[in-house]
């Protein structure tokens, strides 16, 4: 399960700049004994202290030294988890992954013996929904930054509270700089008689050891700059409830003038200016205003569409120009920026909320809370004195809300409700009851809407007792690490026979930053980059978002076809080479990054996409829906097979409009970048792009229709194939509705208010219609009435097995045989011989020949004592391979990984070696038609990511089906699965070799053949 959205930022990194040697001077150190005592005495403790006081790094260590391990610490964001874990491990002279570990997303750096574990709130939530109380096998759980009210954080809090009722030994520590103490005390007061939330306040440090922060408001800024005392141009309205939040040109000019004023008055060029603006567009506006001053300023951008870690890494202290950082609220508490002396706060923020009229998430500009403003103030005054400029009047500021509304009150909660209903723990699997117990319960109507929608798409069903229970489809959706809409899209692509294309599109829908580089402030250049990968924008339906999504889809395929396939081939060549190029392996990451830069794509984004892709695919292999059995994994990047790309590299001026700091400091000439000019990188309609784009547009329209309840829908409606058909009636004239149609009786549209309005083409697109209920066009989704419910959209694979699928793979002509790989006791070979001529069976075993007697195998050629992969697939140097590979048409391996290795990593290595050596044999001898059938437990197949291992050696999954144990031998590798609707059974996976193009990579087969037969 995955409820959390993929973000890569930090919140507790605010305390990170302190080196280990400075820990002794932290304000929290004097409170060590008191903190330990209070946590021992109380089940819930709230620790309140200013940013930088040492809460995040020191409290876990206090508890460890008091023998209270294991200890779990949560952070709201991934970057913070890694950063704090590294700092704590370093301070304890411990290797990360040993005593101190962490878990973010798919990355686990920990052992069973780890004593302090750092995780995101989303990871902990997933574990609680998956394992219930068993996920909390810790002595203490620390929930850090509880003031950051994400949906995940609020759900973690309510789940932990429910489990506290069941486990009296559990200790919970809440930590924050700005938490509302009274609210948390009230929230936990029902734990038990005589229990209460104990509050430990960390005193502020000695004033001599901290730097001063001066706060100025709009009226003071106006005085400094000598502008008009009429402040309405910058803050139109006396209070937040009436004032417009729009960032007007006058405010941008004021910010610009303030930056120049600070630069003029501050002699220390190393002191930076941080500007908070709410949107990408407002960042762009200020960026363009600063362009004429790039000789004086080095401008950096912090926005979620830009890789935050790379942006921070680029922020070196510049001694010749002042650093100006333009940032959204990602910089409030997510990052630590060195040498920030000035903060300019627009006091606006972009808020995501559920728009019921558009039936999708939307955004709006809002005034920040005073708590948010304090977080922004905390960005300065750490290493030097700081000044904060709040661009609202002081009286206005005092009327701002104290805290921002929690996310749980602003979203549709569809995905969260589904995940709650999927958990097995009765304490937390009733969505209505659990959400009503949240610190800020959402509107019951919102929860009911979510439940109704999940019922309508048959992700949930109602039990006879009225409980909401997940269907197979619902559990499958909840298992993906994707957003709700992306999860539905993936399944629908699977039903169309394009599962892997759908997974890639679904992952890209949820990914920021996307792989194709978006030069900040230069949208035309970005669209040029997009056009290099997808030129079908004029032939597909949908808007800009669909076009950009398809371009990134093609960019990923291009990376796989041109770069990854090349290095997969190099790996195979190196495998048998006597002189292995060790430097190539070490240099590979840099080579790949350079290649990506040549083609305006981001290496880090590709790896993020790949990780989510494999995780989503693994869920399908665990659940095995009906359509997976015939799902062919041959990638679309092999269409056309003749695809060819040759890089032509030219030096071009850097797209950065300012010089890099190191170039200026060292008096270097203006930087140039090397780019591939062999464009377009992907020709029109390569990789089946247009067909996939049309399918995507159609599926998005269907999803929008499904998830939009019709006013006349009684719960028994089914979608019309064309939901905008007007049944011969002319639609209403939208100009008539607006009062300015000048065609009168000549108009071909109807001028009556009773007529049907034409459909809004934007409403059914991925971005939706921005006009909501005020749109002149219709947002109604037509349905036809039926007297029955349609069948469930996604059913599990049928349990029955048959001999036919496997026997159909065996050669039927007089020539050709099958090879049973490493059948130690001939168990499977004997069973196959009962169904297939024994004289056409080859069988190998790593066991030595014994007194083996089976009359059914009298004509079978058995090769004893052959080890894997050498001897069986490829013989050692100077030895002839005993297997007559020219006769083999099908290779079968009945694999129990535990019989080969005792750890998953070693088992992966066994499988990797198998596919690599098979690829060398089949490519070198041009035996492309040989099929490889791997039979193993599907859960192990998923956990070991076997499909990925095969793909790295050009083997692609063609089909899969249940193993017929009665006909072909009982399979010993069984895994007991406790979770409902998950499958655990032996499956036969059929892999086909798809050789890479010799047009793209030259005559590689002769090199492999030479290596193969010269050994």
From Swiss-Prot:
| Residues at which ATP binds | 49-56
**What residues form the membrane-spanning segments?**
none
The UniProt entry, under PROSITE patterns, shows: HELICASE_ATP_BIND_1, HELICASE_CTER, ZF_C3H1
Keywords attached to this entry: ATP-binding, DNA-binding, Helicase, Hydrolase, Metal-binding, Nucleotide-binding, Repeat, RNA-binding, Zinc, Zinc-finger
Q: What is its EC number?
A: 3.6.4.13, 3.6.4.12
- Domain Helicase C-terminal, residue spans: 254-419
* A GO molecular function held by the record: ATP hydrolysis activity
Q: Which reaction does it catalyse?
A: ATP + H2O = ADP + phosphate + H(+)
Q: Where is the Helicase ATP-binding domain?
A: 36-197
Q: Which Gene3D superfamilies match?
A: 1.20.120.1080, P-loop containing nucleotide triphosphate hydrolases, Zinc finger, CCCH-type
The residues forming a coiled coil are: none
Q: What class of enzyme is it?
A: hydrolase
- Per the Swiss-Prot or TrEMBL annotation, the motif DEVH box is positioned at 144-147
Task: List the C3H1-type ZnF regions, as residue ranges.
Answer: 727-753, 754-782
State the protein's name.
Answer: DExH-box ATP-dependent RNA helicase DExH8
